[in-house]
């Protein structure tokens, strides 16, 4: 005899599907639509396969009972039912107190109370009779487990929760390189979509390569190559439209300026007329000699370019006509590599001794600190454009000692990846001392003609704020970039850990001290849910690789066993443990691949996020394609537990 619950469930189910069966039977296409109506979107390829298995007469049409079997196969997943049954006495209904027990003991929702559990029941339980009794059926439980509330990424981290009132140099800033390119750097097209896409992804520092164009119209392209050209004004109009769609926080326009003074003035007119009051053109009264905070610069556009004179001189010229005035600027290119020519990493004590010697020395003896191998390049800078540069004056990096003595608070230095890599290994303490005071931008080496990227993690480890990547090139570096800047609400600004802001702590990513607070992380890989369908995934072995990126000692990965020929619901039930020394800098990446013995592995999907942004308990890991497309409902089902020592 059917129970009260079973009758209620049957009535609810038939009320949802009966209109679709008025003609008797339904096709695979209607089956797919009906599943979506029941709040369970599916990949059509999976539906087709299960439909075929239940089409007993091979007519391409199924009955209500056949559909019920398909529905249960997709919704009443074995691993979900197992968890549900653990907290129910009759394996039919989850009482409210049992739901609270599950949420606190398994999901670590420690603030869960009666009102919160009722809210979950009201939101996810579809059967009215069960909902009214403040209980949950497997239908409601499955809907809750597949909801956004059970995603791996903490909802807290999905909001701007960090202190946004620190100076700009205290933040990692999402930055792009050659933003105008959507392919390689030699023949590839320049496209306005490069800027739109980067801004929508939360990028806050865009690169604009500016050159003289015909009819006094500055253009944007990769100079001395066959890449196509964009009008500067078109780029600026697009930025104006999309700058603050994803984030309210400031956008920095990094101008690679090759224009004549006349066309620099045209650029100035375009910037002022397009951005209006959004364009920062004067120092903020509260920040005359220090960098403002992201909060103070909300909805502002900052110009990063060469600048002549001081900020006080710029303020004195406010409102004056600067048209036709261009000044010569000598850019000194230093090739002194004394600081990065050593073979042994410098210790914290050695660095402190060297800084002390500098402070005690006669300033006149420091005048030659960057004289070796000096070259001079003369530039002509339009005063009008120069005066738009306030807190982001562009300077080439010379060396750390020069910066300590001469660099001004509003100067942003840039260095190529090769030099930055060498310094991060040999002069990590000094590098962190530098980035704690000044914004530092690291860009890909010029030999990356294919627009490939470097691993940004090694430069985040020493506090570099603007680690500029080719956003148009998918792969591991961009996965790390996207994962890093998921944090803090995807605002494009992530507060650096205190040990990268406080130079007295003596942090060295290459030799992290034992007085930190490591994390012991345990992940039970339970199953895959409707993994992406292609020919290999249905015929090949599927593996999951869990990778950790952070300081060098935290780089590690572990791999699951292979599951054969099952992309719909592979089961692993494997447990992996990681000891992470510096969790504040660590990212974790889940990779799903098909294992090909002849053709090599093929990526099915991946997901990357900061370790400290992971929820505990039973969680769903969404998957994204190589290009960054969301592959919902494809996901991994895992159990997460970790503690800090």
From Swiss-Prot:
Protein's UniProt keywords contain Cytoplasm: yes
Database matches in CDD domains: C2_PLC_like
Gene from which the chain derives: Plcz1
Organism whose genome encodes this protein: Rattus norvegicus
Keywords in alphabetical order: Calcium, Cytoplasm, Developmental protein, Fertilization, Hydrolase, Lipid degradation, Lipid metabolism, Nucleus, Transducer
Function: The production of the second messenger molecules diacylglycerol (DAG) and inositol 1,4,5-trisphosphate (IP3) is mediated by activated phosphatidylinositol-specific phospholipase C enzymes. In vitro, hydrolyzes PtdIns(4,5)P2 in a Ca(2+)-dependent manner. Triggers intracellular Ca(2+) oscillations in oocytes solely during M phase and is involved in inducing oocyte activation and initiating embryonic development up to the blastocyst stage.
Cellular component terms per the entry's GO annotation: cytoplasm; nucleolus; nucleoplasm; nucleus; perinuclear region of cytoplasm; pronucleus; sperm head
Protein name in the entry: 1-phosphatidylinositol 4,5-bisphosphate phosphodiesterase zeta-1
Pfam families, A to Z: C2, EF-hand_like, PI-PLC-X, PI-PLC-Y
Domain PI-PLC X-box: 162-306
Active-site residues, Swiss-Prot/TrEMBL: 177, 222
């Amino acid at each position: 005899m059917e129970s009260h619950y079973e009758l209620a469930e049957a009535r609810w189910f038939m009320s949802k599907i009966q209109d679709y069966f008025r003609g008797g039977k339904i096709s695979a296409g209607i089956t797919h639509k009906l599943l979506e109506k029941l709040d369970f979107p599916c990949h059509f390829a999976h539906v087709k396969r299960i439909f075929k298995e239940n089409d007993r007469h091979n007519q391409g049409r199924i009955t209500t009972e056949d559909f019920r079997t398909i529905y249960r196969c997709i919704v009443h997943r074995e691993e979900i039912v197992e968890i549900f049954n653990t907290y129910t006495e009759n394996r039919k209904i989850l009482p409210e107190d049992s739901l609270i027990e599950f949420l606190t003991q398994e999901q670590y929702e420690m603030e869960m109370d009666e009102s919160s559990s009722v809210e979950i029941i009201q939101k996810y339980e579809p059967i009215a009779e069960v909902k009214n009794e403040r209980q949950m059926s497997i239908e409601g439980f499955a809907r809750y487990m597949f909801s956004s509330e059970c995603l791996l990424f903490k909802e807290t981290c999905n909001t701007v929760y960090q202190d946004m009132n620190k100076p700009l140099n205290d933040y990692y800033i999402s930055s792009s390189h050659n933003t105008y390119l959507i392919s390689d750097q030699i023949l590839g097209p320049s496209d306005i979509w490069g800027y739109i896409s980067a801004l929508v992804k939360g990028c806050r520092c865009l690169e604009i390569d500016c050159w003289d164009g015909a009819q006094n119209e500055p253009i944007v392209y990769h100079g001395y190559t066959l890449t196509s050209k964009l009008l500067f004004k078109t780029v600026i109009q697009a930025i104006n439209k999309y700058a603050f769609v994803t984030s309210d926080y400031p956008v920095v326009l990094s101008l690679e300026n090759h224009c004549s003074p006349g066309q620099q003035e045209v650029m100035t007119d375009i910037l002022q007329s397009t951005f209006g009051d959004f364009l920062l053109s004067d120092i903020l009264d509260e920040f005359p000699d220090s960098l403002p905070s992201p909060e103070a610069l909300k909805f502002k556009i900052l110009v990063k370019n060469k600048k002549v004179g001081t900020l006080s001189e710029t303020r004195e010229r406010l409102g004056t006509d600067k048209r036709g005035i261009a000044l010569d600027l000598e850019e000194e290119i230093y090739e002194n590599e004394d600081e990065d020519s050593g073979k042994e990493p410098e210790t914290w004590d050695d660095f402190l001794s060297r800084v002390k010697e500098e402070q005690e020395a006669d300033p006149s003896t420091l005048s030659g600190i960057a004289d070796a191998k000096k070259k001079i390049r003369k530039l002509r800078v339009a005063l009008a454009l120069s005066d738009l540069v306030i807190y982001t004056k562009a300077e080439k990096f010379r060396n750390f000692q020069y910066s300590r003595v001469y660099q001004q608070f509003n100067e942003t230095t840039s260095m190529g990846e090769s030099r930055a890599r060498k310094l991060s290994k040999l002069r990590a303490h000094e590098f962190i001392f530098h980035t704690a005071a000044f914004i530092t931008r690291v860009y890909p080496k010029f030999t990356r003609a294919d627009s490939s990227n470097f691993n940004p993690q090694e430069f985040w480890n020493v506090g570099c704020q603007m680690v500029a990547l080719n956003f148009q090139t998918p792969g591991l570096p961009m996965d790390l970039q996207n994962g890093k800047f998921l944090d803090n609400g995807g605002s494009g600004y992530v507060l650096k850990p205190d040990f990268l802001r406080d130079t007295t702590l003596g942090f060295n990513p290459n030799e992290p001290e034992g007085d930190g607070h490591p994390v012991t992380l345990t992940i039970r890989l339970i199953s895959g849910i409707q993994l992406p369908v292609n020919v290999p995934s249905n015929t090949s072995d599927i593996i999951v690789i869990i990778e950790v990126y952070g300081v060098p000692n935290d780089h590690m990965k572990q791999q699951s066993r292979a599951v054969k020929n099952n992309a719909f619901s592979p089961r692993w039930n494997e447990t992996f443990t990681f000891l992470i020394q510096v969790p504040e800098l660590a990212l974790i990446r889940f990779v799903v691949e098909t294992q090909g013995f002849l053709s090599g592995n093929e990526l099915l999907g991946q997901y990357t996020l900061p370790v400290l942004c992971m929820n505990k308990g039973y969680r769903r890991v969404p998957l994204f394609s190589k290009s960054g497309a969301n592959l919902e409902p494809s996901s991994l089902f895992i159990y997460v537990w970790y503690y800090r020592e």
